[in-house]
Amino acid sequence: MSDWNPSLYLHFAAERSRPAMELLARVPLENIEYVADLGCGPGNSTALLHQRWPAARITGIDSSPAMIAEARSALPDCQFVEADIRNWQPEQALDLIFANASLQWLPDHYELFPHLVSLLNSHGVLAVQMPDNWLEPTHVLMREVAWEQNYPDRGREPLAGVHAYYDILSEAGCEVDIWRTTYYHQMPSHQAIIDWVTATGLRPWLQDLTESEQQHFLTRYHQMLEEQYPLQENGEILLAFPRLFIVARRTE
């Protein structure tokens, strides 16, 4: 599991694209020239940006070679760069930085977010969506299984919180619109939940384990999911998935 799997990620393409569409709908910009899609993945969010601003110069950034290859194949009219978001520097100030479900993987948001604002031009926008599920059973159980089986903690850090992000971005000279939404995804089985998180949140926990260790981990994780997520009357499962949205516009 050394690289991201675009096919596995896109298995839930509609569910993953919906937050990006809802974030994009709140971006208060019309005619823009330079856009960066941070953590573009296989290009599903980049395609939305290209559809809204077909004349803009859009650059997708991702650290995964597999994701970049998939994005380039899908969107030949956009530019894609394999790079670490923290180190990438645009050639010019940006009108929009779009980051859908990517910044939660990076540490030090108190430094990262002001840095991203500094890459914007006057009245440019930073639009961010991050899964806020650190306390959801899906992610709590990952940590519990790892503790039970004596594996190191490889989960990401929790988000800083609504009030912290508001202060960080206000102090960086932005007007801030921030909200939180919980989606309830209809899952056909507990295995489907595992399929969902294996493409994202579960990756760090499994990537350094042997095949046997991975199977042991997933078997126990499946058992614990069954305890936490009861079946609905029709046999499906409702997976609560909270997400934090931020649209910050420079006032300078």
UniProtKB/Swiss-Prot annotation:
Membrane-spanning ranges: none
Keyword Methyltransferase appears in the UniProt entry: yes
Superkingdom classification of source: Bacteria
GO molecular function annotation: trans-aconitate 2-methyltransferase activity
Catalytic activity: trans-aconitate + S-adenosyl-L-methionine = (E)-3-(methoxycarbonyl)pent-2-enedioate + S-adenosyl-L-homocysteine
Classification via InterPro entries: Methyltransf_25, SAM-dependent_MTases_sf, Trans-aconitate_MeTrfase, Trans_acon_MeTrfase_C
EC number assigned by the record: 2.1.1.144
GO CC annotations on file: cytoplasm
Alphabetical GO biological process terms: methylation
Purpose of the protein: Catalyzes the S-adenosylmethionine monomethyl esterification of trans-aconitate.
Family, as annotated: Belongs to the methyltransferase superfamily. Tam family.
Protein name: Trans-aconitate 2-methyltransferase
Organism: Escherichia coli O7:K1 (strain IAI39 / ExPEC)
